[in-house]
Amino acid sequence: MKAGSIALVTAGLVGGLALALSVSGLLGSGTLAAQDAAELARVAGGETERVVPGNAGQVNLSFAPVARAVQPAVVNIFTARVMRQRQQMGAFFSMFESQPRVENSLGSGVIVDGAGLVITNNHVVQGADQILVALADRREYPAKLVFAEPRLDLALLKIDPQGSALPVARLGDSDRAQVGDLVLAIGNPFGVGQTVTQGIVSATARTGIGVSDAQFFIQTDAAINQGNSGGALAALSGEVIGINSAILTGGRDGGSIGLGFAIPSNMVKIFLRGASTGKFVTAWVGVEGEPLTAESAKAAGLDRPTGMLVTAVSAGSPADQAGLKAGDIVYAIDGKEVLDPGALRYRIASQPVGESVTVTIVRRGSAQNLKMNLTAPPENPPRQLTQIPSGSILAGVSIANLSPALAQELGAGLPERGVVVVNVPREAPAARTRFPRPGDIVESVNGQRVASVADVRTALGAAQGQTLFRLNRNGQRVECLYQAPAQFGCRAVA
């Protein structure tokens, strides 16, 4: 990495992060539709007014009470992983068993339940053979992993306090944080011991960080370094509003440059609900959409391209039952601004299944609020996971019918219907050509539209030496031509 370059690193074994989630209130706009939408959103959201320090005495107030309230519930996490090395020195030396190598790493965590439940990042404990949790008061307990969700980069540990009382952190409402709010990042950077750093919420609803799937992150300038992963980002109320997860670094040292990111506490709450049932499920909307352009925003009466343009609504979905229609612009959820499809996914994912939300929309230049009841995504059609047999460039590749449930499992942004590539084994012929890739949607084979696993198998069976595939790869159309026995090429198409 060149000095001064910016690279994303995960915090924990590699790096740390702290951040407070903050969601800014909707801004007033110049056009009537935008003003109406913003007002409806404000009523639904109920923001709390912030005040700046009014005098020197207030400026000099200490953060010590906040630190004392949160620090006891923030723990250090030490992990060990046994790595066995392959013997490469011939038959004679293979008689001697290779010595295992132990890889140690460290991170942080937050106690969220007096029974001994500790939340941390998945990357802190993934693959660990031994986990040790050390409290701020020097008590130490072995821990076991009881639940993990790699898509969120969250994991839940369990320790046995053996009848002793444990300090417990309070999880706050991360949606109430705002840019400029003061926050504290608490963790174990570089293993030096528990450390508190102070900063502000630098940005809210930050997406595209690349650490976990379908998420918003809270950005903060509080100093975060290696070992902070899984630690707390605390508001001045003494509540935890984020879990440290990642940092952006410059140069080779991997240290903090004031760009840290945390998983919002509201998403942590949904994760904990999933842990209690053994399965992480987020609410389903049943819409497809695209970001607003300046042109479409102007046509809708908005003076800026904020919102998601609805392009399709699934029949019988929560969106359909709420009255959403193609062409509507989703402006806010419960008063919280929706910038794009990713923002909508987060706003819905951070709400419990079974709850209802207020959706602020703009329809034909007029703003209105709709009530939407959230349900779990259905497994319809059945996924019919299938491995393609030999005799095709796709031999060994696993495909499945997409459904709302499978789309949620596989990751953000996938459509809720069609045929998706689930797995490409390393030994499969397709792996050598990097075609297809997991997550690709197969739209047609030799010009024949395919809507199910059965359609794909039929089309492949009819192919004679030359096969043209049309794919949807992360929203980009791609055509790939395979000519037996070994000619292959792909190109992007409009």
Where are these regions (language model features)?
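C-terminal accessory/binding modules appended to enzymatic or scaffolding proteins
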Residues: A395-P429, P436-P438, V442
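Short, low-complexity, Pro/Ser/Thr/Gly-rich segments in the mature regions of secreted, periplasmic
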Residues: E479-A494
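C-terminal soluble interaction/assembly domains
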Residues: V422-E427, A431-N474, Q483-A486
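Serine-dependent protease modules
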Residues: K2-T358, V362-A395, A400-A405, R417, ...
